[in-house]
Amino acid sequence: MTAHLTRPALAVRGTGCSTGPVDLLTAHGKALQEFDRRVQVIADDQWDNPTPDTDWSVRDLLEHLVGEQLWVPPLLGGATIDEVGSRFDGDNLGDDPIAAWSSAAAAARQAWLEPGATGRTVHLSFGDTSATEYGWQMTMDLAVHAWDLARGIGADDTLPTDLSEVVLGMVRPEIHRWAGSGLFAPPMSVSAGADVQTQLLALLGRAR
């Protein structure tokens, strides 16, 4: 279970992924698409469905991801947490949650694709960090929550192998930093021959 964090200011310092900005943008785009394709098929009677994050319904999960996307343009634009303030507090879904997601996701993706965006510094609550590190954390969140959402609505929960591989490569060396942070449930054991998606989910406290 992930902690209920809306503000990216609470992301964990120290992401050890060694891949470069081009790989980040590719992985981020794919993770965004994976989450989006599940959002687009949420039925009207599924908003209260539970998800693998036991404290979150489908609507709660989407609220979290919409909030994260709304923060991206101002943070990549150099704004501080205090400057953004309470702008994105409260309900960001309104009467049309899918449209709210589509708008926020498109604006976030455009911000990432701006020339030089991945080379910037973002101002988070724990201090300044690279946009690349922030981007990998957002990519991880999108990918893992795509699986959560798929489970919540009974959709296909398979993630692309290459996306699972790159996110697993980012998560594995960092998981010890997150122990006791409340960001994720403790890692789960998997068999030696488990596929990469199963390994990724298990590291983040999820059983496939």
Annotate each predicted stretch with a short phrase:
Residues 2-37, 41-54, 74-208:
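Structured surface interface patches that mediate subunit assembly and partner/cofactor docking
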Residues 61:
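Extended, alpha-helix-rich binding/interface surfaces that flank or overlap catalytic cores
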Residues 64-65:
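Glycine-rich loop at the start of a catalytic domain that most often binds anionic cofactors/ligands
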